């Protein structure tokens, strides 16, 4: 019999402590438990909405918790399946004739590319996409989620809306109410109202117990009281069954030579990586007490998790914003919180299946509609308008094209429109990927920025600024810069914090709105 000696175990424990940010604390264990309780229904709902067996949603979150922390990256982000990927995953499943194996092959390929992006330190590529286009993409995902979950919320027979696109589904909402199952619709609408009410209630109780958990507990009670398992329709409740058989699924690469396969690889890679990088960036700006994240390491961790999930047919995982927000609120400080969130989910899946199968699908739909609303709330539209009318135009254009076609076309349309608008502002096509800087002849510690600063030049200028800083430059002067767009202003806000370089001259340029990060241009004065 082979046994591990203490001397053999010690190096492994030391490696885990280093990877996870020290020994596990009681705060991390507590946060892991509370996040797991919140992640359980979300993971079930995301899997079901994506067209996957619900158990695979939990399995994906388990992998996101147990295996990604080893690679490092972000100390406080929680990895798991996300509502923002429902649209792509369900579209892939539909495109490949419901073949989970082909989608698994797409995910496995995506994971390898994700890991390579992190290893090659290309995590900063997420900066090249215009802010308003990214927000438009997320808002369109929110609208698609809402459209596809309304009939589930109302208890409409899935056969009546299977395969429909979001715009027809929005137009069919009055008909869905006519076809609603009164009992299921009541549960769904009560769940939705409770989520909106409880999310706006302030108090100690709601910092400890997530509103989603209260809703699920209440609807489990309702489903038992109303005997939905025996008297409700077959689609009323979550079905788990023998989840261990799902792990036998293998990736099917037979479509790897097709354009469709690589289109979805690109979509999976783009949206999942971008959402993760946005989450990591957002929480780096918050004073959480956690160590600063390494976005490249986080991509590597995501790639490792997604590779494992591709091999077993799971859903893609990202650094998920809702769970991460909860983790910060619950006091999680290290990657152990993510690990314990995965461990507790594993315990739930093994021991609590009878209870999980009492959860109404309408309650899960309510959770997803609430998540979708947060992505596309009126506040998002108003905040975009405040930055500038041209930003709202980009935002709306991305949404419209996405709803009419798909996410890839929506983002491409938004970026093309952005470049067209920049052309009207005087930016020449030759300057779309060009930098123009020189040292100030009157001040050897200052770098003059002389060319347009737009989203497509962010990485190029970042390289120039880093080189200049290494040579002793202490400030960047934008007084002669002809144009700075909103995405570049957002980049400068973050870059100034990281580099501690002084920014000069931005207030001398004329902004397009009163927003501090509004696009601005040089107004030449007549002498």
Where are these regions (language model features)?
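Core transmembrane helix bundle of multi-pass membrane transport proteins
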Residues: 1-32, 89-90, 94-290, 345, ...
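Hydrophobic/small/kink-forming positions within alpha-helical transmembrane segments
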Residues: 36, 66, 84, 115-116, ...
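Membrane-embedded helical hairpins/re-entrant loop segments and their flanking transmembrane helices
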Residues: 16-21, 25-34, 38-75, 254-336
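Hydrophobic residues within alpha-helical transmembrane segments
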Residues: 63, 81-82, 108-112, 190, ...
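The feature marks cytosolic C-terminal regulatory regions of anion transporters and related permeases
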Residues: 374-527
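Alpha-helical transmembrane segments and their helix-entry boundary regions
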Residues: 57-58, 76, 84, 103, ...
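Hydrophobic alpha-helical segments within and immediately flanking transmembrane helices
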Residues: 42, 59-71, 82-95, 341
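Membrane-helix interface "capping/anchor" motifs
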Residues: 70-80, 200-207, 329-335, 378-386
């Amino acid at each position: 019999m082979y046994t591990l000696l203490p001397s053999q175990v010690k190096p492994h424990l030391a490696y885990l402590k280093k990877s996870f940010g020290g020994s596990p604390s009681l705060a991390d264990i507590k946060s892991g438990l509370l996040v797991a309780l919140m992640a359980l229904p979300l993971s079930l709902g995301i899997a079901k909405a994506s067209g996957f067996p619900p158990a695979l949603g939990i399995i994906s979150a388990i992998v996101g918790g147990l295996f990604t922390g080893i690679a490092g990256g972000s100390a406080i982000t929680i990895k798991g399946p996300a509502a923002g990927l429902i649209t792509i995953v369900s579209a892939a499943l539909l495109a490949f004739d419901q073949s989970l194996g082909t989608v698994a092959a797409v995910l496995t390929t995506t994971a390898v590319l994700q890991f390579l992006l992190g290893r090659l330190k290309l995590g900063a590529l997420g900066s090249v996409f215009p802010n308003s286009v990214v927000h438009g993409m997320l808002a369109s995902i929110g609208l698609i989620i809402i459209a596809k979950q309304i009939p589930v919320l109302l208890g409409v027979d899935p056969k009546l809306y299977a395969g429909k696109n979001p715009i027809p589904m929005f137009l069919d909402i009055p008909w869905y109410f006519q076809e609603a199952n009164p009992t299921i619709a009541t549960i769904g609408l009560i769940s939705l109202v409770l989520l909106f009410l409880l999310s706006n209630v302030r108090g100690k109780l709601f910092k400890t117990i997530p509103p989603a958990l209260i809703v699920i507990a209440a609807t489990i009670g309702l489903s038992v009281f109303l005997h939905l398992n025996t008297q409700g329709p077959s689609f009323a409740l979550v079905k788990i069954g023998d989840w261990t058989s799902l792990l036998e699924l293998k990736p099917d690469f037979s479509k790897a030579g097709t354009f469709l396969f690589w289109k979805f690889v690109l979509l999976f890679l783009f949206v999942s990586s971008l959402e993760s990088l946005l989450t990591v960036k957002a929480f780096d700006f918050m004073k959480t007490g956690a160590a600063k994240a390494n976005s490249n390491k986080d991509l590597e961790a995501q790639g490792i998790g997604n590779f494992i999930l591709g091999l077993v047919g799971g859903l893609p995982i990202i650094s998920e914003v809702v769970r991460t927000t909860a983790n910060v609120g619950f006091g999680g400080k290290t990657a152990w919180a993510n690990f314990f969130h995965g461990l507790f989910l594993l315990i739930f899946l093994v021991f609590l299946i009878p209870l999980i199968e009492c959860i109404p699908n309408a309650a899960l739909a309510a959770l997803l509609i609430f998540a979708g609303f947060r992505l596309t709330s009126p506040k998002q539209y108003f905040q975009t308008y405040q930055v500038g009318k041209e930003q709202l135009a980009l935002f709306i254009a991305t949404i419209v094209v996405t709803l009419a076609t798909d996410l890839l076309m929506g983002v491409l349309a938004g970026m093309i429109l952005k470049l067209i608008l920049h052309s009207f502002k005087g930016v020449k096509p030759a300057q779309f990927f060009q930098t123009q800087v020189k040292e100030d002849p009157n001040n050897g510690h200052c770098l003059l920025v002389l060319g347009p600063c737009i989203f497509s030049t962010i990485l190029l200028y970042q390289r120039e600024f880093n080189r200049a800083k290494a040579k002793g430059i202490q400030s960047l002067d934008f007084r002669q810069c002809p144009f700075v767009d909103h995405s570049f202003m957002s980049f400068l806000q973050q870059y100034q914090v990281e580099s501690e370089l002084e920014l000069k001259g931005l207030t001398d340029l004329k902004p397009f709105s009163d927003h501090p990060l509004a696009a601005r241009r040089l107004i030449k004065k007549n002498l």
